């Protein structure tokens, strides 16, 4: 009887706790449902050990990409994969060819399901993949893919039909020896209409000589032995390749100044006009060190201005474990802001753009200091409820699976944290009322944002460590308007990468960047998405092309994809 009464009390307390939480949560018309399995995304993404990560190479995971590879108007899906180490050994596990882990390409069937076309597309490859960036580097109309690895990076040229050729060597991008490629971005550094390529290198790592967990000062966390690094491991340098327009890339890392920025552990790289001068800059989130903002000097060289711009450290002046980047205009002032995700016991940085290349970290003032026990990875500033303000979603997952057995506060698997944008002033945590797609725990890394089903709202695809990917369908239930802008460059690169699109509707001004990489090691829908609230039309669409040209359209009807071709 006492047991039954105690059970009733526990049940009542649980109900009261749920009711109190639910009552306190703001009204939120968005529910995320993970439809990955129903959509055909059933293959687990292999990445390192299940219950223990012996070496840092097993921890970082990889990105995903939403990209229309076959030009049918529907987003296809690339999920990067790692592999495993042999038990007790310092080498990759052996697999039969048919069973070997591989990155996978899924073709959108346009009916809510995807077909695995990995082999047909020519991208089967086993290894420790990191990041993907996308763009039409040869301006032939097909989106090409660049994938970084621990080992050898790969450039896949799109044949135009969603199949690919590995052209790494003939493009001049084959590297000697083993390097750990991390973030990358296609970027037109010199306004010649050709996409150049920025590539970050995380650190120098030798599996044969790597220290065991607990074997040094940088091999424990909260007194518990864990895999070593990144602190204490040697750093590497970043690379910049100039597109020569003949199918090859030329290494200009030294003369451009990119390789001169040293002593960092760079991760995700996002390229856009962050300083507002019409030239494309590169922002790099760095792990455990100051982040980098490469300002384009307009002469083929770059200077790191992260410290003076306010984007190197957090609001307390500390370096953070920078993982992912979300770029967008959260306060609707027409300027591109930045969110940078971090490690447990920290909060995201929210770099509010003040104009003229200056930023301030407004994370605490904006209400982002409420979740700090999770390791944060892929992130996106996307208007999930189409009310005209960019919301925030980031995925979580610890790098030490063994920790949760000793420290319950730091679970290996965590939620997808969702913040509603409250009119550009503050963010409100709505994770608990965003559906099982948000609250079900996973150890996630990359996330890509885009309209997978072409219904006018933003969905999310997520890389999960040693699980199948998640496909979060946005079940927005309201009637707010929207518009999407697809670009085709003529003087600029054909894919429009690096452009900033500004939409004005009813006095509300919103900016979005067209990015080759963002989130965590991932690539989003190239179509710029804008919520319009109660409005059905936009007063003006302004495109700031990477060529420097500014183009405007007026009085445009909403609820559709508007294609804008650059004027010559």
Map each language-model feature to its residues:
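Beta-propeller blade signature
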Residues: 102-108, 237-244, 295, 352, ...
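Gly/Ser/Thr/Pro-enriched helix-cap/hinge segments flanking short amphipathic alpha-helices
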Residues: 28-31, 39, 49, 366-367, ...
């Amino acid at each position: 009887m006492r047991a039954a009464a105690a059970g009733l009390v526990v049940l009542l307390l649980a109900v009261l706790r749920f009711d109190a939480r639910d009552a306190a949560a703001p009204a939120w018309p968005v529910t995320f449902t993970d439809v990955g399995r129903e959509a055909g995304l059933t293959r687990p993404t292999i990445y390192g050990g299940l219950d223990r990560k012996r070496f840092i190479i097993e921890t970082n995971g990889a990105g995903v990409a939403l990209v229309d590879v076959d030009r049918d108007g529907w987003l296809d899906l690339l999920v990067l994969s790692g592999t495993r180490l042999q038990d007790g050994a310092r080498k990759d596990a052996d697999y039969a060819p048919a069973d070997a882990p591989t990155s996978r390409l899924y073709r959108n069937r346009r009916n809510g399901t995807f077909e695995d076309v990995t082999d047909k597309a020519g991208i089967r490859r086993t290894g420790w993949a990191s990041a993907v960036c996308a763009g039409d580097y040869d301006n032939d109309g097909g989106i090409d893919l660049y994938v970084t690895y621990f080992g050898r990076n790969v450039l896949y040229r799109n044949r135009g039909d969603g199949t690919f050729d590995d052209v790494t060597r003939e493009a001049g991008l084959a590297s000697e020896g083993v390097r750990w490629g991390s973030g990358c971005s296609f970027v037109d550094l010199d306004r010649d209409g050709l996409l150049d390529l920025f590539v970050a290198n995380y650190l120098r790592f030798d599996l044969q000589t790597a220290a065991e967990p607990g074997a040094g000062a940088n091999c424990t966390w909260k007194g518990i032995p864990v895999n070593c690094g990144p602190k204490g491991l040697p750093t590497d340098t970043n690379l910049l390749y100039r597109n020569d327009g003949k199918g090859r890339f030329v290494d200009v890392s030294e003369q451009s100044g990119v390789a001169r920025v040293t002593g960092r552990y760079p991760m995700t790289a996002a390229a856009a006009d962050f300083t507002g001068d019409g030239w494309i800059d590169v922002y790099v989130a760095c792990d455990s060190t100051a982040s980098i903002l490469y300002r384009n000097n307009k002469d083929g060289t770059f200077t790191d201005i992260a410290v003076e711009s306010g984007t190197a450290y957090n609001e307390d002046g500390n370096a953070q474990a920078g993982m992912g980047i979300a770029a967008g205009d959260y306060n609707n002032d027409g300027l591109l802001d930045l969110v940078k995700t971090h490690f447990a016991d920290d909060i995201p940085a929210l770099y509010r753009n003040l104009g003229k290349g200056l930023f301030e970290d407004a994370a605490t003032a904006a209400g982002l200091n409420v979740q700090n026990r999770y390791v944060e990875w892929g992130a996106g500033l996307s208007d999930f409820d189409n009310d005209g303000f960019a919301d925030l979603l980031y995925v979580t997952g610890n790098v030490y699976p063994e920790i949760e057995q000793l420290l319950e506060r730091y679970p290996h698997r965590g939620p997808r944290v969702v913040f509603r944008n409250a009119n550009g002033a503050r963010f409100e945590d709505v994770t608990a009322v965003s559906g099982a797609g948000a609250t079900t725990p996973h150890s996630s890394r990359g996330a890509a944002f885009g309209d997978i089903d072409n219904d006018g709202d933003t969905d999310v695809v997520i890389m999960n460590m040693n699980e199948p990917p998640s496909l979060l369908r946005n079940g927005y239930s309201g009637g707010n308007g929207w518009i999407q802008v697809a670009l085709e460059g003529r003087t600029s690169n054909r894919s429009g990468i690096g452009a900033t699109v500004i939409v004005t509707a009813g006095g509300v001004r919103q900016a979005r960047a067209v990015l080759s990489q963002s989130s965590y090691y991932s690539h989003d829908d190239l179509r710029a998405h804008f919520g319009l609230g109660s409005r059905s039309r936009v007063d003006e669409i302004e495109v700031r092309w990477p060529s420097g040209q500014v183009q405007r359209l007026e009085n445009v009807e909403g609820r559709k994809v508007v294609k804008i071709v650059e004027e010559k």
